[in-house]
């Protein structure tokens, strides 16, 4: 496993504190929410994958915010469809 330095990731985000927040959010997406990594996993942990994605400019706070907004919209649409189906007496 190659050693990951955070300097390139810090340069992409702007400061190390924001970089930590972005990396943690992305790692959580990969580990807990089951989001697919945008880079080869190479048997790395989600935190290392998140840092590599940041270094390559694939992930930043804006992209994470947009992804989370889309996830909420999708979840709400599914809930509305389920409620409509129940109200009409059919099942999904």
Curated annotation (Swiss-Prot):
It comes from the Bacteria. It catalyses: RNA(n) + a ribonucleoside 5'-triphosphate = RNA(n+1) + diphosphate. Its EC number is 2.7.7.6. One of its GO terms (molecular function) is DNA-directed RNA polymerase activity. GO terms for cellular component: DNA-directed RNA polymerase complex. GO terms for biological process: DNA-templated transcription. Keywords: DNA-directed RNA polymerase, Nucleotidyltransferase, Transcription, Transferase. Pfam families: RNA_pol_Rpb6 (PF01192). NCBIfam families: rpoZ. Promotes RNA polymerase assembly. Latches the N- and C-terminal regions of the beta' subunit thereby facilitating its interaction with the beta and alpha subunits. Belongs to the RNA polymerase subunit omega family. The RNAP catalytic core consists of 2 alpha, 1 beta, 1 beta' and 1 omega subunit. When a sigma factor is associated with the core the holoenzyme is formed, which can initiate transcription. This is DNA-directed RNA polymerase subunit omega. It comes from Shewanella denitrificans (strain OS217 / ATCC BAA-1090 / DSM 15013). The lineage of its organism: Bacteria, Pseudomonadati, Pseudomonadota, Gammaproteobacteria, Alteromonadales.
């Amino acid at each position: 496993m190659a050693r990951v330095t955070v300097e390139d990731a810090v340069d992409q985000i702007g400061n190390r504190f924001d970089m930590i927040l972005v990396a943690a959010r992305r790692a959580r997406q990969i580990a807990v929410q089951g989001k697919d990594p945008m880079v080869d996993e190479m048997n790395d942990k989600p935190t290392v994958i998140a840092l590599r994605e940041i270094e390559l400019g694939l992930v930043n706070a804006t992209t994470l915010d947009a992804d989370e907004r889309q996830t909420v919209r999708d979840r709400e649409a599914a809930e509305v469809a389920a409620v409509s189906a129940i109200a009409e007496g059919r099942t999904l």
